[in-house]
Amino acid sequence: MAHPHLLAERISRLSSALEKGLYERSHAIRLCLLAALSGESVFLLGPPGIAKSLIARRLKFAFQRARAFEYLMTRFSTPEEVFGPLSIQALKDEGRYERLTTGYLPEAEIVFLDEIWKAGPAILNTLLTAINERHFRNGAFEEKIPMRLLVAASNELPEADSSLEALYDRMLIRLWLDKVQDKANFRSMLISQQDESDNPVPASLQVSDEEYQQWQKDIGAISLPDPVFELIFTLRQQLDNLPNAPYVSDRRWKKAIRLLQASAFFSGRDAVAPIDLILLKDCLWYDAQSLNLMQQQLEILMTGHAWQQQAMLTRLGGIVQRRLQLQQQQSDKTAFTVIKEGGMFSRRPHYTLPPEASASTLTLLLQKPLKLHDMEVIHITFDRSALELWLTKGGEIRGKLNGIGFAQTLNMEVDNAQHLVVRDISLQGTRLALPGAAEDSMPAEIKQQLETLENDWRQQHTRFSEQQHCLFIHSEWLGRIEASLQDVGEQIRQAQQC
């Protein structure tokens, strides 16, 4: 077996070769390649003339000796046109019912069936057996068929509650394609002279029969770690609780997990990673509504839970809350406290300064800086006699902001705990404290918790960085996940700096 990273590089180069000359079809080619390498089926939905058949033809070149079968279904299609005509000689000479399958679906590795929903019941029933069991009943004998990839296409979805649903459920990967959108790509497509029948894949990249068979065994050996299973189960529960969510059978879940194993294997990993779960968005939808729903649910899972983003933010919220509690406790201890005076029947309570405030001028620190009179203020200097007068009779109180300039009018009050509180123009307030009493440093408990959280964030970011090299995942998803992790990291850093 090739080294995992060499295999991943080879599959990447193989995909690039298959994508050559096809515009805005990279994701479709890659997922069809993944389906072919893992023996799954694909449904392509989209209008006529958008290279659906060309995608299927290209996949033939991924293998060294692959045969292809292509057919356009109509309401009048017969099993003979898909599975081969009856052998007149066998029927006449030996009385045997036998089909001549050479050149037809039973002997093809790559199969493309266009307008699939127009197939009649006789074709559908035989096709179901071929997809499920990779067997074809030819007369009295069961023949194993070599089909590695079935690509079915249509410009419409099957009708609900129809006989077509059983076949639709067998199409594991479902892709919704559209016309070429980008102007430059559209121009390149128009002037391209590439022959669509040419083989764009070097022989050194093509997959041999022996490699293909060995890889099927290797895919099954890829592990599903418990944390990844928990994410899958969470998604399943979310879908079960949504009223408009599509029904996903146990069979489809099982086949989808094998696809995730294949994604991990061909990305050079020995275990399914959270990044592989993004593929589920192309496996679990049924119609346009459920397609959008799956996109939303996967985005919630990937940007909120797959790398512990929401859990880390919850922990951060708890740490910040604990820090506020400690700060409040410290604030109560260090705040400048005045002495309440006055009789029971006084209209207005009045206060006196504590004994330790004996100097003729008092400098009091703001426990939290405020912007007062267009200045960032960290301490205020008061004339002791003016402060005593204000505490006794009320009225206007002035103080020098940061101890400089003229004394400025202040919005100050005594709170219920007999602490002096100064407020800014938006009425945000902070208590005043004597110099030497304020505690500005972060509590050791909080500092340790934030450092631990930051280390956990770094581990999650490293995990994502190591796993993001996945050929089958669109780069837009990687950008969203990276942004979600960076947002968590920024909030942690801001908390450390406060």
Curated annotation (Swiss-Prot):
Keywords: ATP-binding, Chaperone, Cytoplasm, Hydrolase, Nucleotide-binding. The keyword Chaperone applies. GO terms for cellular component: cytoplasm. It is an enzyme of class 3 (hydrolase). GO terms for molecular function: ATP binding; ATP hydrolysis activity. It is found in: Cytoplasm. Pfam families: AAA_lid_8, ATPase_RavA_C, bpMoxR, LARA_dom. It catalyses: ATP + H2O = ADP + phosphate + H(+). The keyword Hydrolase applies. Its EC number is 3.6.1.-. Transmembrane segments: none annotated. ATPase activity is stimulated by ViaA. ADP binds at Y23, G49, I50, A51, K52, S53, L54, E196. Component of the RavA-ViaA chaperone complex, which may act on the membrane to optimize the function of some of the respiratory chains. RavA functions as an ATPase. PANTHER family: ATPASE RAVA. Homohexamer. Interacts with ViaA. Belongs to the RavA family. This is Regulatory ATPase RavA. The lineage of its organism: Bacteria, Pseudomonadati, Pseudomonadota, Gammaproteobacteria, Enterobacterales.
